[in-house]
Amino acid sequence: MPALIVSVILNPGSARRLRAAPAPHRRLGALAAALALVFATAAATARADDKPEVTKAKLGFIALTDFAPLAIAKEKGLFAKYGMPDVEVLKQASWGATRDNLELGSGNGGIDGAHILTPMPYAMSLGLVTKGNKPCPMYILARLNYNNQAISIAAKYMESGVSKDASPFKPWIEAAKKKGAKPLTFAMTFPTGTHNMWIRYWLAAGGIDPDVDVATIVIPPPQMVANMRVGNMDAFCVGEPWNQQLINQRIGYTGIQTQEIWKDHPEKSLGMRKDWVDAHPNAAKAILKAIMEAQMWCDNPKNAEDMAKILGSKNWINCNIEDILPRLKGETNYGDGVRKPKSGEFMKFWRDHASFPYKSHDKWFLAELRRWGYFPAGVDYDKVIGEVNRADLWKACAKEIGQEAMIPASDSRGVETFFDGVTFDPADPEGYLAKLKIKNLDGKKGAKK
């Protein structure tokens, strides 16, 4: 900043010594001009300071409806709007591939961040699912959505009454045991992922031990329907559009949607490598702001059909719009011929704080990982969450895009209640575990996947 301008601001009396401004009105004019220049210079400096360090990043996604904010940010030019025109959004074959490519990082042919199952950044940061159990530090920058995953059941069980209640599976389980036959098989998408937690919670609520009574297998989301068609599993848990596609192809039906297990539950997150974010803080914020704006677009019901067309294209999910649109519009057809279709069961991208990464939600996922023996005893929940969850970055970005009103009063949403009446108090995760009847804390029971 020119010294003369500083002098005028800090010592207005010095303006009297300026030959160009001997009269009072001319002195004021000089001061106003100087102030204008100062503010313009400061604004330009701020813009330069906020400029992304790079214009490129590689983000992964799985072919699921809830990756929509990444597709929309790319298709609608939002990454470019925030100074990141060269962001690539790259399809991953499975959650295992997502993990592998995050471990590599873009510098080694992998990716920098991803549409990811909310517990995965924790499992990776702790080295629970990485090669050689070497930690791969990750951050969660935002939640991508609430709701709209489902547990789908093979058509042959339609008359058994398996739906919200999993207990009607019990006679089938016992019959298989008596015959020495293959146990009933339940598929999910990744061991330390949300879908494994949902199907385990549902089975346990019905009195079925997922580590003893049934077999569990890992299947990538786009392969679920094909595998059920050939009889490789009796039920699966996955996100849309695959549950709707199963019904459209008359292979099975929806037993329960996950928002019926836990209303407005968190699902996917925007996860990024810690080292990438730390090295490119402005670029990380630019990506986050683009995603947040995309979430607002996705949450507008008027955009549902446009979004379904975009997501269904070959570039993205590559499926029929009829597999995506109904549940995107909040319309649920269970496909069992018994329960009436429902409306209003929306996947939420922005409303009701769907984008904010509540730390209390992360704590529930860690408690469930602990419940089933994936998460070791003695780990400090709050310390781990503090290292991974970047709610602070989300709040900063919300202010910068004019969404300060969407910042919740607390990082905790408080006590949560599940469909079986069980409550989770984030202040006491171990107390929550103590009251659960079916669990596998040491991971030694059965052949846990």
Regions found by a protein language model. Give the residues of each.
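Bacterial N-terminal signal peptides that target proteins for export
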Residues: 5-32
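Bacterial N-terminal signal peptides
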Residues: 29-41
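Sec/Tat signal peptide C-region and signal peptidase I cleavage site
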Residues: 42-48
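Short, glycine-/small- and polar/acidic-enriched structural segments
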Residues: 49-218, 227-244, 251-264, 420, ...
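Sec/Tat-exported extracytoplasmic proteins
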Residues: 77, 82-83, 106, 155, ...
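Short glycine- and hydrophobic/aromatic-rich loop-to-beta-strand nucleating segment
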Residues: 150-152, 269-272, 276-277
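Secondary-structure end/capping motifs
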Residues: 279-392
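Conserved C-terminal helix/tail region of periplasmic/extracytoplasmic solute-binding proteins
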Residues: 363-449
